[in-house]
Structure formats: C-alpha cells, structure tokens
Amino acid sequence: AREVIHRQLLPSDEVESRIALVHKPYHQAVQAALNKAHSHFGRSLLIDCHSMPSHDQHDKPLADFVLGDLHHRTLDPAIGDLLTKIITEAGYSLAWNHPYAGGYITKNYGRAATRQQSIQIEINRRLYMTRKYTLDRHGSKNIAALLTRIGEVLSDKLAKA
C-alpha cells in the first residue's frame, strides 16, 4: 500500500528552495563527476539503479531486470550485450526498455555518441524483498553479488576499450 507523502502541494518558495539547495547541486555534482571521468578516461558510464514492483499496473509479472537505454540512444550496444549476457547467465529474466526505457538521469547524462553513456537498471523487488517489504537476506546477497559482478566486468571492459 502506498502512503501519501504530501497531502497538499508544497508552497512555491519551498519547491524553489529544494531545487536550489538539493536538485541543482546534486545534478551539478553528477555532471562534474562524469566530466572528470570523461576527461581522464575518454569515456564515462552512469548506472542509475532503481527498485521496481513485481507486477505492472495490469497485474502482469515484470521481468527480474528491466534495462533502459532510451531505445539504444544512451549506451554502446556492446555494453548492452555484455549486460544481457551477465544477467541472463546468472539465471535472471531480462527486458529492454519496457516498461522502463530510462528517465531523467538516463536522458540527461547519456550520450552514447560522445562516449558519455548511461543505463537505467530496474531490479524487481521480489528478488530481494518479502511481500511485507522486509529484506530477504538470501535474495539481497544474490543481487549484491550480481551487481558487484556487473561493476567488475564493466570496469574491465571499459578499461580495455
């Protein structure tokens, strides 16, 4: 069950304050980190991980992982192929760009043509949480191990590219 966070719209001065004090500095720091990586290595890759529900709005089960690259605009296809291989070889189901193709971060920081890449990774909650939204220790260890493997393989691949 979802809980209401705000029962009414925030006052405009509060919204402006949050944008100025949180949103803008955060995104400036992200861009600065990507610029630094790009300057140093000639490329960068931003991985934006999210938790997703186990079923869509029509109660249809979702894949274990949904990867979004805005329909091949933000990620080198070779990196996408490598991610597909790692995830499916670990025994997980995978979908690309549906129902999540990528959001604000993927769109704003992914420019595959300039070697500043981004990928959105949605992870199905049922892999690491119980139905009561508590941590499933076994599942969370498996997901942590897979994410570590992804990081290691991508680091190695990008270092050699």
Identify the residue ranges that each predicted region occupies.
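N-terminal catalytic or cofactor-binding beta/alpha core of small enzyme domains
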Residues: 1-46, 51-161
